Structures are given as C-alpha cells and as structure tokens.
C-alpha cells in the first residue's frame, strides 16, 4: 500500500506552483513530525481528540481523495473524482468485508496523495526530506518507549455515529496502518514527483524495505511503518549523490540531485535585492 502511494503523486503544473510560491517556506517541514507527536499526545491527555479526528477524517478523506483522482494523482482525470463517491459507499455499506476495507484504504491513500503533493509544493525539497526522516525517528521513539500504543488503540477504536465508516486508520485483512504511515509515503512520492524514474525507484525501494522490515513482526508486536519509507528515501538519496541514479522530469530532462534542486526549485534561492 505504501509503495503505491509513493508512486502516485504528480508534480503541480507551473501555474499552480506559482500560485503556491508565496506560501513556500522551511517551516512546513515540521508538519510530518508534528502530526504524529501532536496526535499521540493530544489523545493521551484528551481522549476526546480521537472522536474529533474521526469526524475530521470522515469529511476530509473523501474530498482529498477526489482531488487526487481528479487532479493531483498520476493519470488523474476530472471525471475520476466521482470514483471517490463509489469508494466511500463501498466502505460505508460493507465495512467488514475485504472490499470495504480495500475501498477505505484506497480513500485514505489517495487523500494522502493530495496532502503530499501540496506539502511538497510549499516546502523546500531538502527540508521536507529531513521532515520525513524526523517523522520516522519520532515514530520509532514513541513505539520503543510504549507511548504510542495506548493512544493509537483509542484512535483506532473511535467510531462516528450512524454506522458511518472509520477513515482515520486503515485495516485490510490482518494488516493495520495508521494514517501517518500513508501520509509519509505520499510525502516521499511528492518529493520525487517531478522525477518519474526516481519516484518509481523510490516506490520499489519502499516495497522491498517494508517486506524485509516486516519480518521483525516475528519477534515484536509493533513496528514503526514510517521507517521503511525513510530508509527508501535515504537509499535513493545515496544513489543520487553517488551519480548512480538519475531521474527524468516531466519534460524528459535528466538531472543530478544538486542540479535538480538548483534548477527546478529556483524559489529556494535567495532573491536578489530590489533596485
């Protein structure tokens, strides 16, 4: 699931990138780590936060998924936004079936794609990469110190009234993922969205690392699912820095990591003084 989310974001077109330019700044890189630490401690000290997040997800996830299907995902078409309605209905009407669980997971993953594209558009690439690694470190610390499990159980158990679907976490068969686990994957996809080949390699790396990482479930009950994404990022960056990995942009050009940051993200540079 995470690998698919990594492969889905596409870069904003120049018009929208220019519109969002005024919002661009390093501070947005705090969002990944703040999202996991903030949610866990908010639920820990105010359990009603879980109920509020349940209703927030109920409203926001289908809308964000529709945006991904109609605009910000690879292969997006405006009419595909209607697919989100169908996925929501399947999730709602068949909540305990594999079809319902799969539809819910797709909605959550697609909603994260929208968030990943938008956040990567307003955050300098190098800072967002640091944010991904910081999120994985925070996730690992919370699990190792047993501070994540209890609040997470409260969040997973929270249900909206009226039999409406739970969209704040993902359950597919025996696999459970938190929303943040898909969010971090979307951030990785957003980082490389302008370099299709690198993005695809990052998705494959995420799948490979996660498959090996999951073997640890043989000896432990809880694992930070953000870690495989961060490791995939680090491996990709090592390949880019060593010149062994080069990616094509949407216009077909190739660039090394430093060239790409300098050339395709000129807004990161300090503008010349006004005269």
Kindly give the residue locations of the regions a language model identified.
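A membrane-topology feature that recognizes alpha-helical transmembrane segments
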Residues: 1-275
């Amino acid at each position: 699931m995470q690998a698919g989310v990594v492969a889905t974001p596409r870069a904003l077109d120049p018009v929208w990138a220019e519109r969002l330019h005024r919002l661009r700044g390093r501070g947005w890189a705090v969002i990944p780590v703040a999202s996991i630490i903030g949610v866990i401690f908010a639920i820990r000290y105010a359990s009603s936060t879980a109920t509020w997040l349940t209703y927030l997800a109920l409203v926001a996830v289908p809308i964000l998924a529709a945006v991904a299907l109609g605009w910000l995902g690879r292969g997006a078409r405006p009419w595909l936004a209607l697919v989100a309605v169908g996925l929501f209905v399947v999730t709602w009407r068949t909540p305990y079936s594999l079809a319902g669980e799969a539809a819910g997971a797709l909605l959550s993953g697609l909603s994260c794609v929208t968030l990943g594209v938008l956040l990567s558009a307003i955050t300098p690439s190098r800072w967002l990469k640091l944010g991904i690694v910081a999120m994985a470190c925070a996730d690992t610390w919370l699990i190792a110190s047993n501070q994540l499990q209890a609040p997470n159980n409260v969040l997973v158990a929270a249900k909206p009234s009226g039999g409406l679907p739970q969209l704040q976490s993902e359950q597919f068969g025996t696999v459970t993922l938190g929303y943040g686990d898909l969010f971090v994957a979307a951030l990785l996809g957003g980082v490389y969205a302008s370099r299709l080949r690198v993005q695809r390699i990052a998705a494959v790396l995420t799948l490979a690392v996660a498959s090996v990482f999951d073997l640890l479930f043989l000896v432990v009950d809880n694992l930070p699912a953000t870690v495989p994404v961060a490791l995939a990022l680090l491996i990709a960056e090592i390949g880019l820095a060593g010149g062994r990995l080069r990616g094509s942009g949407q216009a077909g050009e190739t660039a090394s990591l430093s060239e790409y940051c300098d050339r395709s993200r000129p807004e990161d540079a300090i503008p010349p003084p006004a005269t």
